From Swiss-Prot:
UniProt xrefs under NCBIfam families: trmA_only
Protein name, UniProt field: tRNA/tmRNA (uracil-C(5))-methyltransferase
Gene, per the UniProt record: trmA
Site (Interaction with RNA): Q190, D299, R302
GO molecular function: rRNA binding; tRNA (uracil(54)-C5)-methyltransferase activity, S-adenosyl methionine-dependent; tRNA binding
Length: 366
């Protein structure tokens, strides 16, 4: 695979290899055949980051080869959304001959939605001033004249200039209901929107008929907690990143959801609060004991669950675990399988043509 060519003819074979690999990894814990969710074969990534290479009068996007570290020129990127591809061409055309915008520009980040909105961030090794803002506004207006619904941001050391806003609003059809998700620049969002829809619908399916409340750790912008709210009496969710919490609060209001409570704290801190080890001012006014959480949802970072959180989640009758790293999932399952068994197993092909796998398991108490 090269950045400008996807081996789409190999899609089925690479997916089949992942299924075999996941089954092999899960064999000590389950003999289930994974439910398999396929990605679009191209234009599936909704965000991308590129370094910018200056070559005389020319400049262009590059990425670095992971093995050789050599740079690779990228003029089109079929893994990314069609909107990102349009913007890549338009941004280079708009910046190449503009001394103010191109000087010391070293990176461009793209974030797009299925609803055809975009935030483009230009990163600089220089101070950004009013002259930069004026030129950036002219570029933004020229892009919009090409029917590109785009917001531009300039970034430099300790500086962030938003010309309009630093977010876009995604609209996803999830099990017959449109969900609105505010996505903030430089915050985590699911990279493959089509796969995200399938993950949300799978999570809804496996929690059908749930009793009581849901507790979610690492909730981000509320991606899962808001979609799952319809299956539970109440949802209590934690997240540490301030921009994600603010986006989650917006998303609760935008989706007219009244049974979700977001708390800004780390999963480790919340574990201490639940176990009565520490009290936190942030929890004043929230009666943790009033929640009857029969199900806990975790979507941890690549490192998986720490040992304290492992112990905490074992107290819940049902554990829904979305993993972006099956190796750490299996490490967690060495502990979790002592008290719980795997009821459902899914493979989500979030990153086609790479070795990365995303998977989901539903665990129920033995």
């Amino acid at each position: 695979m090269t950045p400008e060519h996807l081996p789409t003819e190999q899609y089925e074979a690479q997916l089949a290899e992942k299924v075999v690999r996941l089954q092999s990894m899960m064999a000590p814990f389950s003999d289930l055949v994974p439910e398999v969710f396929r990605s679009p074969v191209s234009h599936y990534r909704m965000r991308a980051e590129f370094r910018i290479w200056h070559d005389g009068d020319d400049l262009y996007h590059i990425i670095f080869d992971q093995q050789t570290k050599s740079r690779i020129r990228v003029d089109s990127f079929p893994a990314a959304s069609e909107l990102i591809n349009q913007l890549m061409t338009a941004m280079i055309a708009g910046v190449r001959n503009n001394p103010v915008l191109r000087h010391k520009l070293f990176q461009i980040d793209y974030l797009t939605t299925l609803s055809n909105q975009a935030v483009v961030s230009l990163l600089y090794h220089k101070k950004l001033d009013d002259e930069w803002r004026q030129e950036a506004e002219a570029l933004r207006d020229a892009l919009r004249a090409q029917n590109l619904n785009v917001h531009l941001i300039g970034r430099a050391t300790k500086t962030k200039i938003e010309l309009d806003q630093d977010y876009i609003d995604e609209r996803l059809p999830v099990a017959g209901k449109e969900m609105i998700y505010r996505q903030v620049e430089n915050s985590f969002t699911q990279p493959n929107a089509a796969m995200n829809i399938q993950m949300l619908e799978w999570a809804l399916d496996v929690t059908k008929g749930s009793k009581g409340d849901l507790l979610e750790l690492y909730c981000g912008n509320g991606n899962f907690s808001l979609a799952l709210a319809r299956n539970f009496d109440r949802v209590l969710a934690t997240e540490i990143a301030k921009p994600s919490v603010a986006a989650a609060q917006y998303n609760i209001a935008a989706n007219h959801i009244d049974n979700v409570q977001i708390i800004r704290m780390a999963a480790e801190e919340f574990t201490q609060a639940m176990n009565g080890v520490r009290e936190f001012n942030r929890l004043q006014g929230i009666d943790l004991k009033s929640y009857q959480c029969e199900t806990i949802f975790v979507d941890p970072p690549r490192s998986g669950l720490d040992s304290e959180t492992e112990k905490m989640v074992q107290a819940y009758p049902r554990i829904l675990y979305i993993s972006c790293n099956p190796e750490t999932l299996c490490k967690n399952l060495e502990t979790l399988s002592q008290t719980h068994k795997v009821e459902r197993l899914a493979l989500f092909d979030q990153f086609p043509y790479t070795h990365h796998m995303e998977c989901g398991v539903l665990l129920t108490a033995k």
